[in-house]
Structure formats: C-alpha cells, structure tokens
C-alpha cells in the first residue's frame, strides 16, 4: 500500500451540514421543514446525476435553485419568494460540522495535504468555507465546475489526482455520501465513510475501506494506518 499523501474531502454533507439552511428558517416553514430539506437535497443530487448522464451540464448553483423550486412547490410554498431567497442566502453560509475545523487542522499538522473535491462551484464553496472557518485549513479547493462533470463520474476523481499530483492509492477520500464513497472506491481511492447515523452499507462492489461515526476520529485512523 502506498503511503497516504492527501486527504480529500467531500464538502456538502461531510464538512458542511446541508440541513442548516432550512433549519435556520424552520419557524417560517412549519412542520414540513425536515421533509423539505430532505427533498431539496435529494433533487439537487438527482439533477447532478441526470445532467451528467445526458451531457447537459449546468453549475451546482443552478441545480440547487431548481431543486429548491421543486421542493417548495411540493409543499405549496413556491409563491413565498422571500422564503426562497432567504433559503438560498443561507445555503451560501452553511454551518460546518463542529469537528470539521479541528480535524482538518490535525491532518495538516501531521503533514497531510488537505483538499476538497466538490460538486459545488467556486463561488458557492468560497462563501460556505469562509462561513465555516475552513478556508485556512485547506490546501486546495477543487470544483467539478472546472471540468463540467459531476461526481461520481471517474473523470472527476482523476481530475483531483491531476490537481494534487498524486496516484489514487495515495489518496484518502472522505465522504458521508455512500454514492460518493462508491464512486471513489471504484476509482481506486482509499475511502473513509463518515456515517453519522449508522446507515446501512451500500455499493458492495466498491465498499468503503473504513467507516467512522465522526470526522474527529479520522486523524487517529490515518496515523494508525501510516505507522
């Protein structure tokens, strides 16, 4: 096994809590807030996959907006333009998970290159990383917008290798999303799934190498693997 040189993270759902945009305005949304947040996320991801399959790329902000429109209409809230605008503003400033900053800092201190590989475009990522105080803890922020293909297409993971000048076997890829872990594992990355709520394992043809319940466990795992 090659030594791990780079720790590459998914952003949305892994370092950044995608539910905080809706939860920030839950009192205005009412009892459907959790369902709306879940549907928004589901459609956002679905649109990224279908557009990649169709060869009809649009940036992640457009997909995020279109997915929110669908979710709001599904709950009879599409006419609430003020609510839509506030939710989109909140998505630009998603909260980071509490252990994200400390984990990234510990990895950098241990000598690992830290990077994000995200479907988000650069403008989205800059705002969210700044709001979450993550900018200084990352060596690189890699957006699929540069190649206009979404994860989990293998070309995206190769793009990260090219940007970081590493082989797949030298990458530890970290994500909370099973589909992303499956794609990264099939490509050849060493994968770690952050499974905060103990969801069942998926994509058995490319299972995660390791599973953790929090980001804070990651530095110790990597130090153990590199000894």
From Swiss-Prot:
<dbReference type="InterPro" id="IPR051540">
    <property type="entry name" value="S-2-haloacid_dehalogenase"/>
</dbReference>
<dbReference type="Pfam" id="PF00702">
    <property type="entry name" value="Hydrolase"/>
</dbReference>
<dbReference type="InterPro" id="IPR036412">
    <property type="entry name" value="HAD-like_sf"/>
</dbReference>
<dbReference type="InterPro" id="IPR006328">
    <property type="entry name" value="2-HAD"/>
</dbReference>
<feature type="active site" description="Nucleophile">
    <location>
        <position position="10"/>
    </location>
</feature>
<feature type="site" description="Important for catalytic activity">
    <location>
        <position position="157"/>
    </location>
</feature>
<dbReference type="InterPro" id="IPR023214">
    <property type="entry name" value="HAD_sf"/>
</dbReference>
<feature type="binding site">
    <location>
        <begin position="118"/>
        <end position="119"/>
    </location>
    <ligand>
        <name>an (S)-2-haloacid</name>
    </ligand>
</feature>
<dbReference type="InterPro" id="IPR023198">
    <property type="entry name" value="PGP-like_dom2"/>
</dbReference>
<comment type="function">
    <text>Catalyzes the hydrolytic dehalogenation of small (S)-2-haloalkanoic acids to yield the corresponding (R)-2-hydroxyalkanoic acids. Active with 2-halogenated carboxylic acids and converts only the S-isomer (or L-isomer) of 2-chloropropionic acid with inversion of configuration to produce R-lactate (or D-isomer).</text>
</comment>
<feature type="binding site">
    <location>
        <position position="41"/>
    </location>
    <ligand>
        <name>an (S)-2-haloacid</name>
    </ligand>
</feature>
<keyword id="KW-0378">Hydrolase</keyword>
<feature type="binding site">
    <location>
        <begin position="11"/>
        <end position="12"/>
    </location>
    <ligand>
        <name>an (S)-2-haloacid</name>
    </ligand>
</feature>
<feature type="site" description="Important for catalytic activity">
    <location>
        <position position="14"/>
    </location>
</feature>
<dbReference type="GO" id="GO:0018784">
    <property type="term" value="F:(S)-2-haloacid dehalogenase activity"/>
</dbReference>
<comment type="similarity">
    <text>Belongs to the HAD-like hydrolase superfamily. S-2-haloalkanoic acid dehalogenase family.</text>
</comment>
<dbReference type="InterPro" id="IPR006439">
    <property type="entry name" value="HAD-SF_hydro_IA"/>
</dbReference>
<protein>
    <recommendedName>
        <fullName>(S)-2-haloacid dehalogenase 1</fullName>
        <ecNumber>3.8.1.2</ecNumber>
    </recommendedName>
</protein>
<feature type="site" description="Important for catalytic activity">
    <location>
        <position position="151"/>
    </location>
</feature>
<feature type="region of interest" description="Important for catalytic activity">
    <location>
        <begin position="175"/>
        <end position="180"/>
    </location>
</feature>
């Amino acid at each position: 096994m090659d030594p791990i040189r780079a720790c590459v993270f998914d952003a949305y759902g892994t370092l950044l809590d995608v539910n905080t945009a809706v939860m920030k305005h839950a009192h205005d949304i009412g009892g459907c807030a959790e369902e709306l947040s879940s549907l928004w996320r589901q459609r956002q991801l679905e649109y990224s996959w279908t557009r990649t399959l169709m060869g009809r790329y649009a940036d992640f902000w457009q997909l995020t907006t279109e997915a929110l429109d669908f979710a709001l209409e599904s709950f009879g809230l599409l006419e609430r333009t003020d609510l839509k605008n506030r939710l989109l503003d909140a998505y630009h400033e998603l909260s980071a998970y509490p252990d994200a900053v400390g984990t990234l800092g510990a990895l950098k201190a241990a000598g690992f290159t830290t990077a994000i590989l995200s479907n988000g475009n650069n403008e989205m990522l800059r705002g969210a990383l700044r709001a979450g105080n993550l900018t200084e803890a990352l060596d690189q922020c890699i957006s699929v917008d540069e190649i206009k293909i979404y994860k989990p297409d293998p070309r995206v993971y190769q793009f990260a290798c090219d940007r970081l000048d590493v082989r797949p076997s030298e990458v530890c890829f970290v994500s909370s999303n099973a589909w992303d872990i499956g794609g990264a594992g099939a490509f050849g990355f060493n994968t770690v799934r952050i499974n905060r709520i103990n969801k069942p394992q998926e994509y058995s043809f490319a299972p995660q190498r390791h599973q953790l319940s929090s980001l804070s466990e990651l530095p110790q795992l990597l130090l153990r693997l590199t000894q």
